[in-house]
Amino acid sequence: MRVSDPAKLDILPDDACEIRLTIAASECDKYPAKQHARKVASKLGVRDGLIYLVGKATINWGDSDQPRPFRQRRYFYYLSGVDEADCYLTYDIRNDLLTIYVPNFSLQHAIWMGPTLTVEEARQRYDADRFRYYAALRSDLNSWVDQYNKDSPIYVLHSSQKPEISAKELRSREVKDEYEIRMIRKANEISALAHRNILQNIHRMSNESEIEGLFLDTCVSHGAKNQSYEIIAGSGPNAAVLHYVKNDEPLNGRQLVCLDAGAEWNCYASDVTRTIPLGKDWPSSHAKDIYAIVEEMQEECIRRVKPGLRFRDLHELAHIIAIKGLQELGVLKAGTVEEIRRSGASSIFFPHGLGHHVGLEVHDVSEQPITANGHLSREFVPQMSTPLLQEGMVITIEPGVYFNKLALENSRSLPLAKYIDFDKAEQYIPVGGVRIEDDLLVTSTGYENLTMAPKGKEMLEILRGRSKQ
């Protein structure tokens, strides 16, 4: 859309009022917003135009004067580094000019909630060329339109403000820069502390809610106030529900708990899953065997990560390992590995993709997903067009094997049922499921595992009270 009439810019600013407060400049290096703005313009393939993005507004709950928890829009953050409400930005591509607009000063807001960000504070904190109050936004946009409207579009994010900057055009977020990697690394460090704390104290716990509570407490006490996603602490059969978030059932009589939880640091996510025996050792041979299969799936996939690899190939490898392991246990039967894979039978037990990008979102954006989900109701069809891994990507490797009662019942009427021994599979329902997930940075020579949360033998040593840490 080309904006030719300034009157169409529906922005209603308050009167400008600039109150200057002096604060100490942050010792941290600034978020590389200008670099990201240039990167997005490059991916758009244009040398002209204006990128205009709106930050998250302050919003109250319905029928209430209480505000909803604030979470900055990730596209806005990527081009600004601003984690404050009610801000805006413009990036003049031709003139390489990034401008951040902060809220007008409100004395009432300052008295009740504290003062909002000033332009001087913003200048000290953020990497941009200009900092202005919201009151100047409409006139600035109209001036830009008057100067360039004949041949320069305004790029915005949502369909109501076309043309839009879509996930495809912001594929620049696929490859992380040095700053972003540091943030993801820090998020993983705190997540690892929280996961370790759970292992050291789970013998005292009697309900899933206690696991969630201690994980949150550990993260907040180490400066990570926000989680990357809702904590999943599913015990027993709940571990077979991929995004189980009720976290309110007793642990007594359960074999395992699947803890999928990751801290957020400066808006960047971590995504970590550990499956923990509820005791000092494996509660059953069934639980031990399923953990061993998933452990092998993850280890074999992780060691192959490198630039140029098609992630879909790792996804397929994980399925092959799962099929062979379940065949040995007698859960899968009556066919070759290839026949079982083609039928989709392994997707009854491994129904999700092997991984995804991690960044400003826990499932970060990319031009094209690096893998595809399994299918529960149709034959598997390979997808060969999935993209290759690149240096600087941060991805998860998160295989799992689950015994979901509903999924098993539904599959009885499918053609793939001939490959499943349902009597044997139902013996594993008390196990629930096992998932193990790490965050991997793709490097020039292979990978770096950013996730330090204990698993496998180290996990068992902590549960048995033998760990030195």
Swiss-Prot record:
Its EC number is 3.4.11.9. SUPFAM superfamilies: Creatinase/aminopeptidase (SSF55920), Creatinase/prolidase N-terminal domain (SSF53092). GO terms for molecular function: manganese ion binding; metalloaminopeptidase activity; peptidase activity. The keyword Protease applies. Binds 2 manganese ions per subunit. It catalyses: Release of any N-terminal amino acid, including proline, that is linked to proline, even from a dipeptide or tripeptide. Mn(2+) 1 binds at residues 271, 398, 437. Keywords: Aminopeptidase, Hydrolase, Manganese, Metal-binding, Metalloprotease, Protease. Mn(2+) 2 binds at residues 260, 271, 437. Its cofactor is Mn(2+). Pfam families: AMP_N (PF05195), Peptidase_M24 (PF00557). It is an enzyme of class 3 (hydrolase). PANTHER family: XAA-PRO AMINOPEPTIDASE 3, XAA-PRO AMINOPEPTIDASE AN0832-RELATED. This is Probable Xaa-Pro aminopeptidase AN0832. It comes from Emericella nidulans (strain FGSC A4 / ATCC 38163 / CBS 112.46 / NRRL 194 / M139) (Aspergillus nidulans). The lineage of its organism: Eukaryota, Fungi, Dikarya, Ascomycota, Pezizomycotina.
